[in-house]
Amino acid sequence: MAAAQTFNSNCDPGNFHKLQSFPSESVTYTCKMGSVSSLIDKQDFPHDGFNLDFKPFPEPNCKRGLHQKELLSYLNITKKEVKSNKKFHSGLGFRREHSVEGGENDYPVFYHKDHRGTEFSKSSLPERGHLDKSRFGPSALRSNVKAFMSIQSLYQSGNKLSKSNGSLNTMSCVSSPPCRGPLQPSNSHSNNQSESGNDEEDDSLSDSRQNSINSLNSYSPGFSVARGQISASLGHINHIGGSLDQASRGTRDTMAGEKGTLSCRSMATLSRLQCSGEPPPPYEYSQSVEDVARQLEERLHEKGMEARQLRRNASDNDDPFTKVFEDKRRLWMEELDELKQMYMSKLQQISQQALRSQRALQLQLYKVQQEKKRLQEELNSLRGESEELRQKQSQSDNSGPKLEDSKWEISQKAGEISLLKQQLRDSQAEINQKLGEVVSLKSQLREAKVLVKEKEKESAELSTRLQALENAKSQAPVDLPRDNSDTIDLERLRAELMLERRQNEAQMLTFETERKVWKEEKDKVLRYQKEIQSSYREMYHRNQVLERQVLELRQGVGQSPSSPAIWMDTVET
């Protein structure tokens, strides 16, 4: 009943703008089945008979929700067992998509009357913490189905809770006057409260409990039913509760056999709640409205804890939407982990690239700074050189007359050098002449020496002859006339010898005198030649120095050093 009231509050036209899957129309479900008596006799009703029929809501401003038959028809929409022909009934369709691992996923799709489908694909499933952005309402799918399962467990566990739920449902169905203003704010508050939670099971439980209490509070100002009718409604729901116990047991057996289908017994018993015009049997008043609400809240809390435990222990095959949601949630979490890892790796790569680029930029900045320093130094040196060139240019402008004087001096020195060269050539000719004379004198000296040697030989012969004659004279003194002749010859020979000696000595003296004169002249010539050479060398060095100075002056002035000067021809000659 709490799930039914939750759907009643969610189907309010004031809250339909929050659901993206359904338009602002009331969804009614037409069920092809027999009479009510056949349902009461516990006959099963085929599951292939559900059809979705979309009809416009009769009154947009009606504060009353859907009937119990429509609510139960909506709650009985569950996933059928997958058959070989892939046939789906009750206006439900499934779309097959390929998952990331290569498999196929089936997603349920609602088809409206105008052939517009509401799919429960990956893009339409709700995100955790953002339930208000989904394409369908949170209470229209998983929460309501599990809430209906919790209703069956509530009916099966005891009769007191069934009585309380029956009394509340009877009061909501019998009271025909329109509800007052606090209904819509309470419903919207309950919807917002159910959507803002993080746990879906706690949201469904708080939603159903809040809707039941809000229904009591909304009807309490305009409640005008007598205490006898309240007791009668409680007794009537006690009678219905017994049948609901059997129906809930049958429903659980059927769901265990067919994996998610509901029994028609619960449909038959709960469809009696639609008949609000039947007069309730007379029962005595048992409890007040506050006690019923308090007891209902306590039982709802207890059964909510039990339902939460059952939901935790239930398998995913009991609810197809839950299975789809869990599969999608698992896939989303895996994809989220992969995306986190991918983006973490990308972030690490980007950070490394940024660090490398930062280091490269720092290195480039350092190189640029060094290059800037080097260029600054070169600029300073070029500025200094330009200043020096300017100074040299100013000096060259002032050294114009000095350059002319130096050119004149150079021309004079070149003339002197040419004269010295002429004198050198004359002296060399004289030297050659003197050398010829020396050679002739040497030949004459050799001839004189030969003559002297001959004369010495003759004198030696004469001396030997003289000695022989003296010896003979001493031995033969008798021969006087002969001796006189010999003495005459001897004297003559002595005189000739003395003459030859004197001539030889005279020749030696003349030769010595000539030799001395030649030597003196030779020394004079050599000394003069040395002086000429030294002066020539000195003039040559001075000429080179002057040429260098002229070249420097020309470079300072801007003239090309290769341009010939007037005095260079003279120097070369």
UniProtKB/Swiss-Prot annotation:
GO terms under biological process: nervous system development
Compartments it resides in: Cytoplasmic vesicle; Cell projection, Axon; Cell projection, Dendrite
Polar residues composition bias: residue spans: 184-196, 207-216
Gene: n4bp3-a
Entry keyword annotation includes Coiled coil: yes
GO CC annotation terms, alphabetical: axon; cytoplasmic vesicle; dendrite
InterPro entries in UniProt: N4BP3
Coiled coil spans: 289-539
Pfam families: Fez1
Organism per entry: Xenopus laevis
Region Disordered, annotated ranges: 168-216, 382-407
Family: Belongs to the N4BP3 family.
Keywords noted in UniProt: Cell projection, Coiled coil, Cytoplasmic vesicle, Developmental protein, Neurogenesis
Effects seen without this gene: Morpholino knockdown severely impairs cranial nerve development, with shorter or missing cranial ganglia and reduced nerve arborization. Neural crest migration is impaired, although neural crest induction is not significantly affected. Brain size is reduced and cranial cartilage development is severely disrupted, leading to smaller head size. Eyes are smaller and deformed, with coloboma formation and disrupted retinal lamination. In eye, expression of the genes rax, pax6 and otx2 is reduced. In brain, expression of the genes emx1, pax6, otx2, en2 and egr2 is reduced.
Primary role: Plays a role in axon and dendrite arborization during cranial nerve development. Also important for neural crest migration and early development of other anterior structures including eye, brain and cranial cartilage.
Name of the featured protein: NEDD4-binding protein 3-A
UniProt main location, coarse: cytoplasm
Keyword Coiled coil attached: yes
